[in-house]
């Protein structure tokens, strides 16, 4: 580290010597004497005296006044010294003041003046300047040069002790123009002090320009499953969907049991006689049974009247004679007496209904009959909302019992058990929603009644049916849906019910 510092000192001295040589070679005219001016008061003082006003007590002033002699072209300097001392025992210096308007004040900086000094005249102390340049011409502000490239970082050096700000201002002078090089080179090693304390936080700057949108980041890791949120509000009723296609046709069922023989049909009309067939050869058969009596033949002619017989005694009646031939009709005789009533003829056609006769006398009251036993059997069940859309092919679980006092409805099997044979009335009213419906009333596994309702979407419809059926004791009746058509629905506002009751019982044997 000492070798680097020594190398820096030698390099600086060599540069100073070269610059001084060039400056002395190029300067051929003598610097003119400046006009006589008074040194302005420092730190708000009112005179050129020492140490007055707000100036620190350790600083003094030295005022130099120059007067021109008429007998000589050269001026004679008369110096009035006011001792200027400070903590570092600096020697008194000669200073010459210039008018405040000699140069533009736009090149002055507040960092060159002591605290409290205004934008007035500034004095440059030449005793601390080893390199003299021409200050005859007023400086002109040249164009700003291009920024230079940043040099490589230096090796660094040990930091020298800091110089107090008052001493540094005194060593450099308070009237320093920014365009001159009259700064002591030997003080360059003392400009860098120790690192000071951190200053107060400055005011926040203006917000910067919005940067470009960054690239999309990588997909982050999957977070943990959050807690279940509160149930949302019920949404509005959606639009009605398009009608769906009809369900696929089910497979053909197994062959059912052979049913009982139906009643005989009516006798058909007699067909026409066929053509006479050829006479076939047939051996003589056995003698058949006696046929039925034929129809009576036509009456024969009336016989002639025989001679009158002798009046004899009553003899035995003779045999019945042969029926004589029908005689020719005789002339109209005289009306004879009324003969005896003949045999009863064939019944004639039914005559017209005669007028209603008078009401007869009321008969006596009959004896009291036996008390007939009243037979009852009925049920009525519904569907809870939780059992909506039941599985097809099975009895619908009607678990909401509305009436079942005779307990002929089995809630476990969802079937009605017939106890009293007779004629029953069955009806069902089914609410249909969201899905189509195909329901069937089943008796002992045989579908007796079917209902269809093709409905899709959020609309609600009702499917119902009613029938009279004769049941025998032990028969079972239930309601079931078919495949893909199980749109049975129930809610707090809509019900699906199944009802049955005995209309009249069969008479007991």
UniProtKB/Swiss-Prot annotation:
Listed under GO biological process in this entry are:
otolith mineralization
The Gene Ontology CC terms held by the record are:
collagen trimer; extracellular region
Query: Where does the source fall among the domains of life?
Result: Eukaryota
Q: Which residues form the C1q domain?
A: 372-509
GO function terms (MF aspect):
calcium ion binding
| PROSITE patterns for this protein | C1Q
Q: Identify the stretch annotated as signal peptide in this record.
A: 1-25
Q: Where is composition skewed (Basic and acidic residues) in this entry? A: 213-227
Q: Where is the composition biased (Low complexity)?
A: 302-322
Domain (Collagen-like): give its ranges.
Answer: 193-244, 285-329
Bias kind Polar residues: ranges = 62-75
Tell me the segments the record calls region Disordered: 23-96, 202-372
Q: Where in the cell is it found?
A: Secreted, Extracellular space, Extracellular matrix
Q: Enumerate the glycosylated residues.
A: 121, 246, 311, 417
Keywords, ordered alphabetically: Calcium, Collagen, Disulfide bond, Extracellular matrix, Glycoprotein, Metal-binding, Repeat, Secreted, Signal
Q: Which InterPro entries match?
A: C1q_dom (IPR001073), Collagen (IPR008160), Collagen/C1q_domain (IPR050392), Tumour_necrosis_fac-like_dom (IPR008983)
Bias category Gly residues: which stretches?
Answer: 42-54, 327-342
**Pfam family for this entry, one:** C1q
Question: Thylakoid as a keyword?
Answer: no
How would you summarize the oligomeric state and partners of this protein? Homooligomer; disulfide-linked; probably forms homotrimers. Interacts with otomp.
Task: Give the record's family classification.
Answer: Belongs to the OTOL1 family.
Role, per record: Collagen-like protein, which provides an organic scaffold for otoliths onto the sensory epithelium of the inner ear. Acts as a scaffold for biomineralization by sequestering calcium.
UniProt protein name = Otolin-1
